[in-house]
């Protein structure tokens, strides 16, 4: 019996042999290879290949550093094949990581285990923070897992380096797009969303693609949106059917003069497997495209100002029940149905044409009583407990039926006065 190699060799009288699987003592000799950063984009990942004598599963443990609050990363894989490629995630940078592989039978009973070390390098990206210091941590209130940060670099056109930190503030996962010839120009504009299949998807606003990658950093899909007649803008999400929703511009769309190109006023639904466009919503047929130029006319060339082309500036889209919740920097927060019918709009009432007024929600004080001041309703001033969304972004429906959104503060009260420091602030609002 050869316990180390999980086999017993029977030798017959005629000299022939027959090998039968036998319970071994460890799985050291079942590990064929281990490779750190197999995709080239995730230096805190590894691939371990094992060859098992009989069907079974592998349970992985990535051990936390001694004295840390973050629990070990543990996962039992579903694969029961004889040869398995085990993805290892959650390694520490510049550290000789301790990994445990546990070989179980189909019922989950442990057969044997093995420990191995995986040495990682120092993270090199200049776009990562030089230091992460935990100021306050309430470990008993933290959800399991790690926190995803969409690191933008110094400019919106810089390569985005998304990473995850654990409860101790250590980086444990990263997508270093700069190491990829294919993706090194992906910016922060669309962030990074977790898909239902466990992969991640982002939109490349610099080269107008939609990219799906797995947790290791390997490319699954790379959809060219220009070939489909669109350029990427600011937001992507996934609906309950698995389709991708995205805010885009349509390259063939023109304003009323038939010459100037419209931008940032389309939403599309795309099949993430086939890359087919399943539906398109044109905001010109949903919102008031004549509602622009409300800010200081002396600042119409400013990038924060509106124009006939950039009248909406769509920047958020998510599914909400059977409908959709969207944001446009200059037009507010709105809910619409699959047919494109507007259910309601949260926006200052100023400058809307008459046919849209019935769609505008009325403002309330914090105690639920109606606000009656016409200037507050119009949006030309705030009151102590209410202000409209100004340059709103990324509205998210909450379990309690409320909406959480980011208020950028662009053009607050229809003014773009960047010298008025009291009027320039951003905030999250529920």
Protein language model features and the residues they cover:
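Surface-exposed, short loops/turns at beta-strand junctions within beta-sandwich domains
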Residues: 2-3, 88-96
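Solvent-exposed serine/threonine-rich low-complexity stretches and specific carbohydrate-binding patches
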Residues: 70-80
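Histidine-/acidic-rich catalytic cores in large beta-rich domains
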Residues: 15-18, 24-58, 62-65, 81-85, ...
